[in-house]
Amino acid sequence: MSLMVVSMACVGFFLLQGAWTHEGGQDKPLLSAWPSAVVPRGGHVTLLCRSRLGFTIFSLYKEDGVPVPELYNKIFWKSILMGPVTPAHAGTYRCRGSHPRSPIEWSAPSNPLVIVVTGLFGKPSLSAQPGPTVRTGENVTLSCSSRSSFDMYHLSREGRAHEPRLPAVPSVDGTFQADFPLGPATHGGTYTCFSSLHDSPYEWSDPSDPLLVSVTGNSSSSSSSPTEPSSKTGIRRHLHILIGTSVAIILFIILFFFLLHCCCSNKKNAAVMDQEPAGDRTVNREDSDDQDPQEVTYAQLDHCVFTQTKITSPSQRPKTPPTDTTMYMELPNAKPRSLSPAHKHHSQALRGSSRETTALSQNRVASSHVPAAGI
């Protein structure tokens, strides 16, 4: 039984630990950007650092790229506004949390957050093959190209945070391009693309002109597209977190009620064991009462008064014979006590004299009923 309890507790702990890890961990905060981590040059972005452990003081630092003096170990309360951004702001950021009562103790670092600064190079061009309007189920390919020798292209869809990227490949017409296959089209959307260099991966060009992809035979032209595996993966990940947390909570509830049931059972067993000796004593007392006979002592009192009687004739005698009155008195029950030999002898003597007295009394009564001879 104890092994099952330990197993349930371990399963719940690891499930809950896995769920917490996806959201930033047990003792580290979660860092995010609003409205987006892709910021145009000269724009502003708000960095939010949140924690489940009640941290109210946060420290922000940059891991790579050019250091930003005003952000070096910056202390802030939950959020900080960064901007106007420059190429120096591009890079990877983390934050730490602390309590006001212990400002020198900091939590583990948060998840990494990449800030991308755009508008540093000329914009590329974006096109769709076979065209921007396709039928449902038809394969679509988006091509991002530029005459500049960029190393990487990034495809962005409106309303989606993750941007897939592909390396640039020289084409026959002297341009550098990357082809993004979307697969069978089911939904449309608005797309743009960016270009970047290897030595500055977080400094992007201006966005291309937006391209609207329409899918005929579907009423929702701006819904999710076939290039949404990342968003679906995010949904599955959050669903996994929700399921894991729910299972852990259910296991802890079951464990709580199981321990409560065991505690109540132990208390009931202890109460029954405490009552058993008292019950045995009651039964023994009743058995002793049943074994001891209820002794009742009767004392017969003779009310015959030996007085001088007058002999009368039989005709004057009462027709109803005299009735001897006997009175009984029940004495309280008492356990018989052992008598000493002297007491036993005295009791036997009293019984003998009592029998003699009773016999003498009966003889006298009988003689009083004998008819007298006529004179």
Swiss-Prot record:
Segments crossing the lipid bilayer: 239-259
Localization: Cell membrane
Residue ranges annotated as Cytoplasmic topological domain: 260-375
Extent of the signal sequence: 1-21
Cysteine pairings via disulfide bonds: C49-C95, C144-C193
Biological role: Receptor on natural killer (NK) cells for HLA-C alleles. Inhibits the activity of NK cells thus preventing cell lysis.
PANTHER family: KILLER CELL IMMUNOGLOBULIN-LIKE RECEPTOR 2DL5A-RELATED, MHC CLASS I NK CELL RECEPTOR
Family to which the UniProt record says this protein belongs: Belongs to the immunoglobulin superfamily.
Protein name: Killer cell immunoglobulin-like receptor 2DL5B
